């Protein structure tokens, strides 16, 4: 019955999704401020059409929130669905094979910005609710909260949650904004890494200098910056910042055995990335490095003359953007300060170093023995025919730990993305058959959750 409904309504549901995708809700670009409001309003319309009791676009200190609810019984359990309607910028446009905000279906995939992250995945949740509501199968309450700033750090959502705790009160949170190991290998994300981010500025002379007249007499800020950041990581892949690993919890032998059982083709992985060899912290597998271990990376570096031709200067300043992915129990505020203190301590006298802290967030671990997780397991089994593997991933959704802190509930991360979906990149896509299976799986989650509740 579920599969039949999804198949019969496929074209309508896809067109509804496309109406969201066509709105370029790029939160990072002020030019799209009105598009953020338009997208929020469209979400409100679609949730009302799906059958919620009420839906509203609510103000925040930044982009608006979309809230909706269907209360079947005030005494029943409540599932809160979280997602985000903002998307990453589509640039560089010339690398897209299709128009990023004009979705098309080609080769069995939806091609568009937001096809996966997160309009495509969030809309699965709305369509699963639609089915349950239309067929009088919903035995627990449902609430929805969609924000418009996830791609820029969710700056408004924390204060919004704090202000509306009663409105958002629930027993569990359900999120589709993560991925699967493979199209036929279901998995549930049980861990997210946290994040710290900085910009470092190294200043030498008070102006750009002629490299002939002054070369050899003063330090070059770019050279100094390169050495400073290169020295952070040793040849063994270890991060040399004092105290960095103090709160890192080692994976148990049981967890490491589970990780080792996850299907992973290292040669195919290297091929897909276009690299000849992998590099990371010694003593850990690639999956462990990306899910269970912290990192330190340079995200961008610049300074001096970078235009066409030649200009022989010693620059006055050099800059870099830095990030760390953190594991549960590492406090991003503590790590941020450790990094600032480290660079200040190793900065040579012939330059001035300034490290500016940017946004950050904590990691998250989901237990695999509580009712909602078990319901998710059975939901995947019903559709994919096999039990999903619990996996930790390298990415961050900082607001998940905020939900736990402010609302006191756990989140189940039922994602359906694939690495090949190219989120944040040109040619983002989502396989149509996987999108439909996602709707079916979420429906089954709710049916199984009622048995647990």
Predicted feature residues:
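A generic structural motif
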Residues: 116, 206-208, 324-332, 361
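An extended, acidic, His-containing surface patch that forms the Zn2+-binding/catalytic region
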Residues: 49, 182-183, 240-317, 328-338, ...
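N-terminal helical capping/dimerization or prosegment-like subdomains
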Residues: 1-93, 317, 334
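Flexible glycine/proline-rich, aromatic-decorated loop/lid segments
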Residues: 187-203, 417
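A short core secondary-structure module
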Residues: 159, 215-236
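Acidic, glycine-rich active-site loops and adjacent beta-strand->loop/helix elements
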Residues: 85-87, 109, 145-153, 176-181, ...
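Active-site metal-coordination/substrate-binding segment of hydrolases
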Residues: 76-143, 437
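Acidic/histidine-rich catalytic neighborhood of metal-dependent amide-processing enzymes
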Residues: 116-191, 453
């Amino acid at each position: 019955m579920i599969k039949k409904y999804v198949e019969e309504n496929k074209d309508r549901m896809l067109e509804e999704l496309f109406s969201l995708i066509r709105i370029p809700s790029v939160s990072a670009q002020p030019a799209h401020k009105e598009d953020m409001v338009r997208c929020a309003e469209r979400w409100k319309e679609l949730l009302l059409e799906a059958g919620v009791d009420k839906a509203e676009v609510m103000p925040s200190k930044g982009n608006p929130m979309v809230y909706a609810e269907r209360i079947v019984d005030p005494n029943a359990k409540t599932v809160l669905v979280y997602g985000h309607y903002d998307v990453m910028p589509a640039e560089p446009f010339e690398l897209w094979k299709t128009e990023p905000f004009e979705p098309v279906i080609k080769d069995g995939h939806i091609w568009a910005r937001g096809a996966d992250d997160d309009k495509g995945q969030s809309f699965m949740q709305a369509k699963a609710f639609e089915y349950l509501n239309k067929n009088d199968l919903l035995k627990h309450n449902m609430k929805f909260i969609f924000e418009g700033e996830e791609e820029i750090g969710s700056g408004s959502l924390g204060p919004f949650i704090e202000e509306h705790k009663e409105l958002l009160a629930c027993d569990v949170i359900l999120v589709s904004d993560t991925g699967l190991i493979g199209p036929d290998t279901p998995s549930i994300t049980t861990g997210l890494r946290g994040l710290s981010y900085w910009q470092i500025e190294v200043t030498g002379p008070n102006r750009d200098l002629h490299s002939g007249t002054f070369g050899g007499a003063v330090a070059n800020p770019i050279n100094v910056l390169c050495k400073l950041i290169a020295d952070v990581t040793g040849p063994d892949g270890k991060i040399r910042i004092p105290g960095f690993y103090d709160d890192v919890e080692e994976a148990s032998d049981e967890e490491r055995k589970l990780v080792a059982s996850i299907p992973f083709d290292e040669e195919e992985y290297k091929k897909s990335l276009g690299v000849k060899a992998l590099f990371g912290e010694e003593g850990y597998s690639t999956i462990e490095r990306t899910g269970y271990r912290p990192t330190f990376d340079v995200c961008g570096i610049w300074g001096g003359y970078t235009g066409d031709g030649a200009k022989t200067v010693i620059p006055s300043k050099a800059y870099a953007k830095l990030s760390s992915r953190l594991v549960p129990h590492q406090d991003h505020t503590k790590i941020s300060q450790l990094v600032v203190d480290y660079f200040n301590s190793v900065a040579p006298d012939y330059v001035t170093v300034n490290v500016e802290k940017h946004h950050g967030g904590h990691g998250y671990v989901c237990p695999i023995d509580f009712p909602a997780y078990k319901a998710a397991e059975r939901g995947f089994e019903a559709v994919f025919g096999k039990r999903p593997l619990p996996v930790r991933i390298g990415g961050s959704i900082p607001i998940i730990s905020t939900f736990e802190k402010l609302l006191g509930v756990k989140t189940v991360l039922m994602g359906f993305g694939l690495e090949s979906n190219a989120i944040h990149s040109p040619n983002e896509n989502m396989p149509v058959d996987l999108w439909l299976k996602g709707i079916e799986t979420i429906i089954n989650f709710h049916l199984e959750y009622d048995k647990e509740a």
